[in-house]
Amino acid sequence: MVDDEDDITFDSPEEEIAHYREKYRQALDMLTDTRAELEEFQQSSKELEDEMEQELAANDKQQADLREKIKRLDAEKEEWRTKHIALQKMHSSTTSAMQREMDNLRSERDKTLVALRDLEMGNDELERNERVAISSLLDLESKYNRAIEEKTLLEQDLAQKDELETETQRLKDELREANEEISILKDQLARAIATPPSSVSTSSPIHDAACDLSRIHLSDDINASPLPPPVPSKNKSITPEGHSPRRGLSRSGTMSSIPVASPSTKRFSQQIPHSPSFSTLSRSTTSRNLAAAAGTPGSPALARSRSGIPQASPARGIVLASHQQTKSRGFKLLHDLQARLKATDDKLGGAKVPRRNVSNPASVFGVGKRVTSTTSTTSSTTTAPAPHARVTALAKDHNTTPTAQSQQFPGSGIMSPGWVLVGEGEGEDTPTGPWSMTLPAEPNSPLDPTFRSSSTTSNRSLPSRPGIPSPLASGSARSTTSGTAQRQAGQRPSSRLGLKASRRDSEARPLSPSMIPVPSFSSRPMSPDVYQPLRSATPTSGFSSFSASASTSNPPRPNSRTGKRNPIGRGPPPLSSSTRLHHQRSRQSLSGAGPTPTTGADKVERAKRGPRRSSLSNMDKPSLMSASSGSRTPSGRPTSVHVFRETPPPVPRIPSAILKESKVKK
């Protein structure tokens, strides 16, 4: 512009002044605008500066606040860091403590499990011991109940025994009084009848009248009493006239039931002063031959006949007649006793009681077969009395030959001595045995006298109980084996009196009547004359083997029973057809034979039998012992004993200390 202004040329100075004045005015306007803009700018910048200062102050304040906050947050951060570290330390310590506690709890748990296992094993052992104790307690209770039952049976049998002893003693007293009357009558007759003057004389009318009187009394007594027919034997009972009366008496092959004189009777007979005729009483009391008792050495006629001349005594027939009167009186007493027993059975009520076995009056009073021998001495033409109708009926029911039957069933024949048949009616056929099949079977008492451990009555042995020793097994087995051996060897039965037991049996309990060995039925028992050498210190040689066998077979008996021999109830009862069938089947089963075919009669007999009462009906039957002796106990015997099939196993006892030691070793 300056260049432009330099290039401008003015025409006049006024133009130039005017031009320069214009320019001045322009520059002044421009300055004024610039000053206005500057002031405006200064004012706006001042406002902006104020705003900037305010904003800066706010920023500074905010920055200070933020710095303050940062400081506070840093402090909080440090605090939380320390807290976190403390918490971490606490957590680690707590974790380690919990780990240690967990380890301790694990060890305690293991110990508790071991102790619990030991406790469980001990508990099982205690429970097993408790079961064994309970079973032992049941066993002891069954033994106790059985002992109570046996005690009750013993008391009943003792009461029956006392009653029978009182009745027997009364009969013995009556018999002794009758014997005293006989001795007095004999004494009076011996003094009243004069002795013939010469050694050889004929029979007087008094002798004939006495013989007739004795025959009349003898026939009346035989017809009045229902005697069984005589037992058939090898020897003839009727002797010819040429033989003496002692030689004419035959020794029967069966048992004799003549009662042995009690010690009181023997003492009484020794205290009575001996007269010439009273010696016959002592001989007739114990002698088996009552017919020979009339002609004893006290009679002067017999003393004269021993000198070589046979002479009949006039007092002999009268003595026999008086003797038969006494026997008829004894028969009346015996029948009165039987009537009383029957009345007692009727009073007992509706229960059927087995009929009591009473000793045979024929064998007690010396009638029967010996009566036939007695009558043969006076008259050989005297016939035997007619047998009773009941006896003949029972004899027809059995085998026709008694000898064959006695070989098949020894001691079971109809005429076995020791039994009497009380006639209650002609048509009645009730067996008198305790094993009657038609009656409801009562529980047999192990102490019953008919409960014999022999092959003729029962073929079963006592049951073997593993935990219960039977008090009757040992004695019955010993008595049965000895009785069987003696029966097979044909020896006499062992005596129950005056024999000392062997050392083996000295500690056994006293015998019950069921343990008494049954006497053999093939030979008659010893006479009372034989008892004297057996009681003496040195027995005779004839009975040495017998006493030796008896000492090993007989257990010791109480001293109270020594000398008391009760002849009542000796011998087996008569067998009926059902009983014979039962014995045949039992013998076949014991001998190993095959089973017998069941017939119609067997079914009828089985239907007739009532159910046997037994406490083993809902329990296991006890196993039976081997019947080596050929005898068994009837299965219907009341028994309340629980029988285990096998004994409980022993309890293993493992102490807990041993288990702990074994675990520690593992």
Swiss-Prot record:
<feature type="compositionally biased region" description="Polar residues">
    <location>
        <begin position="400"/>
        <end position="410"/>
    </location>
</feature>
<dbReference type="GO" id="GO:0007059">
    <property type="term" value="P:chromosome segregation"/>
</dbReference>
<dbReference type="GO" id="GO:0000776">
    <property type="term" value="C:kinetochore"/>
</dbReference>
<keyword id="KW-0813">Transport</keyword>
<comment type="similarity">
    <text>Belongs to the nudE family.</text>
</comment>
<protein>
    <recommendedName>
        <fullName>Nuclear distribution protein nudE homolog 1</fullName>
    </recommendedName>
</protein>
<keyword id="KW-0206">Cytoskeleton</keyword>
<feature type="region of interest" description="Disordered">
    <location>
        <begin position="369"/>
        <end position="388"/>
    </location>
</feature>
<feature type="region of interest" description="Disordered">
    <location>
        <begin position="397"/>
        <end position="666"/>
    </location>
</feature>
<feature type="coiled-coil region">
    <location>
        <begin position="14"/>
        <end position="195"/>
    </location>
</feature>
<dbReference type="GO" id="GO:0008017">
    <property type="term" value="F:microtubule binding"/>
</dbReference>
<feature type="compositionally biased region" description="Low complexity">
    <location>
        <begin position="536"/>
        <end position="554"/>
    </location>
</feature>
<dbReference type="GO" id="GO:0005871">
    <property type="term" value="C:kinesin complex"/>
</dbReference>
<dbReference type="GO" id="GO:0007020">
    <property type="term" value="P:microtubule nucleation"/>
</dbReference>
<keyword id="KW-0175">Coiled coil</keyword>
<feature type="region of interest" description="Disordered">
    <location>
        <begin position="40"/>
        <end position="64"/>
    </location>
</feature>
<dbReference type="GO" id="GO:0000132">
    <property type="term" value="P:establishment of mitotic spindle orientation"/>
</dbReference>
<feature type="region of interest" description="Disordered">
    <location>
        <begin position="220"/>
        <end position="310"/>
    </location>
</feature>
<keyword id="KW-0493">Microtubule</keyword>
<dbReference type="GO" id="GO:0005874">
    <property type="term" value="C:microtubule"/>
</dbReference>
<feature type="compositionally biased region" description="Low complexity">
    <location>
        <begin position="275"/>
        <end position="287"/>
    </location>
</feature>
<dbReference type="InterPro" id="IPR033494">
    <property type="entry name" value="NUDE"/>
</dbReference>
<comment type="subunit">
    <text>Self-associates. Interacts with PAC1.</text>
</comment>
<feature type="compositionally biased region" description="Low complexity">
    <location>
        <begin position="372"/>
        <end position="383"/>
    </location>
</feature>
<keyword id="KW-0963">Cytoplasm</keyword>
<dbReference type="GO" id="GO:0051303">
    <property type="term" value="P:establishment of chromosome localization"/>
</dbReference>
<comment type="function">
    <text>Required for nuclear migration.</text>
</comment>
<feature type="compositionally biased region" description="Polar residues">
    <location>
        <begin position="251"/>
        <end position="274"/>
    </location>
</feature>
<feature type="compositionally biased region" description="Polar residues">
    <location>
        <begin position="587"/>
        <end position="599"/>
    </location>
</feature>
<dbReference type="Pfam" id="PF04880">
    <property type="entry name" value="NUDE_C"/>
</dbReference>
<feature type="compositionally biased region" description="Polar residues">
    <location>
        <begin position="614"/>
        <end position="638"/>
    </location>
</feature>
<feature type="compositionally biased region" description="Low complexity">
    <location>
        <begin position="473"/>
        <end position="485"/>
    </location>
</feature>
<dbReference type="InterPro" id="IPR006964">
    <property type="entry name" value="NUDE_dom"/>
</dbReference>
<dbReference type="GO" id="GO:0051642">
    <property type="term" value="P:centrosome localization"/>
</dbReference>
<dbReference type="GO" id="GO:0005737">
    <property type="term" value="C:cytoplasm"/>
</dbReference>
<feature type="compositionally biased region" description="Low complexity">
    <location>
        <begin position="449"/>
        <end position="465"/>
    </location>
</feature>
<dbReference type="GO" id="GO:0047496">
    <property type="term" value="P:vesicle transport along microtubule"/>
</dbReference>
